[in-house]
Amino acid sequence: KTLVILVHPDIEKSVINKRWIEELQKYPDQYDIHDLYKAYPDEKLNIEREQMLIEAYDKIVFQFPFYWFSTPPLLKKWLDDVLVYCWAYGSKSGYKFAEKKVALAISVGIDEEEYSKEGIYNYTLKELTTPFELTFKYIKADYKPLYAYYGI
């Protein structure tokens, strides 16, 4: 099974992310959906619960809208709080993400051409998401190419 960690602060108003989740829910034998904003409306993460959840899966997808060339705030908090020393990296007992397949599924509200060297922002989405790739490589996860839905 694949764990899909949904990080959308207002999924009910979403178009793309909401549709993705509706489609994934048709296959409960293949996907488990963990909605961070629903699980933690106060944004106070249960770190132990999150770590146990990660340990239970070999395939993890982070699904979120691209906000201000980054992530929704709760995903940044999740990365900072969950990926800690001696669990995610830095010791022989750590590296709990090691060899887990990890991918990003991102909705982007503008056209793909805008995210190019020649586009208005001068950077590709792959370049802008390099910190994710580096983070997951650092903790020895098997980082897969991102999937993006451009436009609305």
Regions found by a protein language model. Give the residues of each.
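Short histidine/acidic/glycine/proline-rich micro-motifs that form metal-
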Residues: P9-I11, K38-Y40, N122, Y150-I152
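Glycine-rich phosphate/pyrophosphate-binding loop and the adjoining helix
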Residues: E22-Q25, P131-I152
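Residue-level detector of anion-binding/catalytic polar loops
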Residues: Q30, I60, D142
